[in-house]
């Protein structure tokens, strides 16, 4: 008996045709959509719940586990029903995946809603459905393909290429330009398009009556129409959810590659939120920014060159520019959308008193750490006004290496001042910043101020060189909050704000991020 050639052992009875190539191309689309839903869920959870590392890790873990379940469940789909079930599957993936971001945004605005439960339920459902896609496509191709090894290599190649495409497009184009809600609907439409194409191209192979094919086409049309309507209404849906979340009129809402910026207004109160977290209220921000800026500039009386890291709203700039001896201010903020908004929006420009139009100001849109590594400039005062250290990407800007790098750009007689969270609500976070500065070689003078929007808020003055500091008793510029008595009180801590034992924040442990999460979890639970 002759031995068959090796390829014959790996063959199926159907010949190769053009439909196979189109199915392989469909793999590219469904892989892109599958990863997109995972990224949308992770980004949305990070935006709404904070702690991006935890949220992305848990979302990815749950999603991959659900995909594994879906792959196992796919074995129960009968061979003669593969095409029909694939069409149904794509419609379900498109529907659940497409509406996921909009549904979660709207749900989060309802205080009593079980947001986390619904989030992980949606992730699980979408993951199971996505996990079934590739096994079904491979089985369809195997019934039509001559060589199984070639089939596997082609399917996985296009699977990985689709994942690569969306992993690049999502952070660079889709999320910042379309937003999470519209991006979700877009990929839902892609899944629906695959369902419609399969239904039309393989209509003769479905093994269904004309009536059943018509019913499937009707379902596809309904899903597509719903997703198109959602895509068209994405901005309105996002506006409704954010209006319900923040409670006030939204006058600006911008998605950048780095963050979501929302500015609200209620009567004369303007508020800025970054990723859902309050950054200032115009009713009391002067307290925060006077406390942040003025003690340092009063102490370094000859300060001519000032560095601002963060502070893209221009409110710290407004305080600095009160001093006529200041000749140059360099502001380094990562997000150009932030500095552009506060340079051009009429109400916000009025709030920062046209600070960005002052010829003494230079704006650099760059990562602060990378800029410090390449810049050669020296400064008399450095104002560090970063967001709170709620994740590792921001936590590195509060680390020992970062403060050592910053010290190279501060004159020997210069001072650094840092916003350092709340010594009352987040004592370990606050004193961790102080310990980190000392570990980096600074002498420190911690202080705090009451900002009604935030509560008791903390700052730390620090000297990398031989500069000394005494709380000022007078101010050379107009103030609304600070005077001699207020300043003296700021540098005194009440017994209910004791200093706990903490370790410095290093890059290899990021202890500050852990302290911050634990401190605020205890306050907000």
UniProtKB/Swiss-Prot annotation:
UniProt KW keywords: Cell membrane, Membrane, Plasmid, Polyamine biosynthesis, Spermidine biosynthesis, Transferase, Transmembrane, Transmembrane helix
SUPFAM superfamilies: S-adenosyl-L-methionine-dependent methyltransferases
Record GO cellular component, one term: plasma membrane
Keyword Membrane in annotation: yes
Keyword Transferase: yes
Xref: InterPro entries: PABS (IPR030374), SAM-dependent_MTases_sf (IPR029063), Spermi_synthase (IPR001045)
TM helices/strands, residue ranges: 21-41, 53-73, 89-109, 117-137, 155-175, 180-200
Residues annotated as binding S-methyl-5'-thioadenosine: 259, 333, 367-368
GO biological process: spermidine biosynthetic process
Top-level taxon of origin: Bacteria
Domain PABS residues, every copy: 220-464
Chain spans, region Spermidine synthase: 222-471
Cell compartments where the protein resides: Cell membrane
EC number, as in UniProt: 2.5.1.16
Catalytic activity: S-adenosyl 3-(methylsulfanyl)propylamine + putrescine = S-methyl-5'-thioadenosine + spermidine + H(+)
A GO MF label: spermidine synthase activity
Residues the entry annotates as binding spermidine: 289, 313
Membrane-topology descriptor: Multi-pass membrane protein
Residue numbers annotated as active site: 385
Enzyme class: transferase
Similarity section: Belongs to the spermidine/spermine synthase family.
Job description of the protein: Catalyzes the irreversible transfer of a propylamine group from the amino donor S-adenosylmethioninamine (decarboxy-AdoMet) to putrescine (1,4-diaminobutane) to yield spermidine.
The name this protein goes by in its record: Polyamine aminopropyltransferase 1
Organism field: Ralstonia nicotianae (strain ATCC BAA-1114 / GMI1000)
Lineage: Bacteria, Pseudomonadati, Pseudomonadota, Betaproteobacteria, Burkholderiales
Gene it is expressed from: speE1
